[in-house]
């Protein structure tokens, strides 16, 4: 028998395929299912979802900021500060409050604290009553509660009401850092100077550890403002706290501020937390002004 090359086209759904003599035929494909072209594998079983697929929101939905995975806490590390053992940089982003932008009503500040990869480490929320916020303005005393990814308060910042005039070297600004809440791990105290913003970082025993020095003029357009963190003898720069330029619109019409903190990777985690507290004190002292004043 001569062999002929016959190219068969896919049958229509519902028809039977003819086989060798004596066979009753093969059932055709079900209606509604396409027959794969020659050379392609047939589809697998239907009805089972594909596992381990990333879930994405619909277009226009707000993106969820990922949290930094919690590392194993080292010995003698206050609970919640183990995140700081693996980083040498923090990014602080203040959230925009619509009510404050529209009518100028001062609300409690909220911040996202992230690492250099954009992963959220902490969430900070101010806890101050309405009367104090709107009567004292940026000079107000406040309690800042810093939460981890489990919603636990791991750091508490306490700023008392102090004098804001540089002409009087008494009752200068100060902030206390507690980790965990109720256990002081350090302080940031203002050092009097007629022209420069200066601060001292202290440990829980109020012993001086580092110094902070800012520029003479706390004003800049389209550029960052750096506060250098130095050794006690002012010879070495070990880090800095930078107020980032957020853009002309935000700078003019809101008091939303973004900061960056850089410190040595091997710095004591307690001092890293104290530098975080210094950042909030600097924000309220120099950049938390109501727009239009």
From Swiss-Prot:
Cofactor requirement: Ca(2+)
Region (Proline-rich domain (PRD)): 1-66
Residues that span the membrane, as ranges: 271-287
Classification of source organism: Eukaryota, Metazoa, Chordata, Craniata, Vertebrata
Superkingdom of the organism of origin: Eukaryota
Location(s) in or outside the cell: Membrane
Free-text note on domains in this protein's UniProt record: The N-terminal proline-rich domain (PRD) is required for phospholipid scramblase activity.
Main location: membrane
InterPro entries to which the protein is assigned, alphabetical: Scramblase
Chain residues carrying a lipid of type S-palmitoyl cysteine: 166-167, 170-171
Name of protein: Phospholipid scramblase 2
Source organism (scientific name): Bos taurus
Protein family membership: Belongs to the phospholipid scramblase family.
UniProt keyword Lipoprotein present: yes
Region (Disordered): 1-39
Membrane-side (Cytoplasmic) residue stretches: 1-270
GO-annotated biological processes: plasma membrane phospholipid scrambling
Residues exposed to the Extracellular side: 288-293
Matching Pfam families: Scramblase
Described purpose of this protein according to its UniProt entry: May catalyze calcium-induced ATP-independent rapid bidirectional and non-specific movement of phospholipids (lipid scrambling or lipid flip-flop) between the inner and outer leaflet of the plasma membrane.
Residues the record lists as Phosphothreonine modifications: 143
CC terms in the record's Gene Ontology section: plasma membrane
Any one GO MF annotation of this record: phospholipid scramblase activity
Recorded topology in the membrane: Single-pass type II membrane protein
Reaction(s) the record says it catalyses: a 1,2-diacyl-sn-glycero-3-phosphocholine(in) = a 1,2-diacyl-sn-glycero-3-phosphocholine(out)
Keywords: Calcium, Lipoprotein, Membrane, Metal-binding, Palmitate, Phosphoprotein, Transmembrane, Transmembrane helix
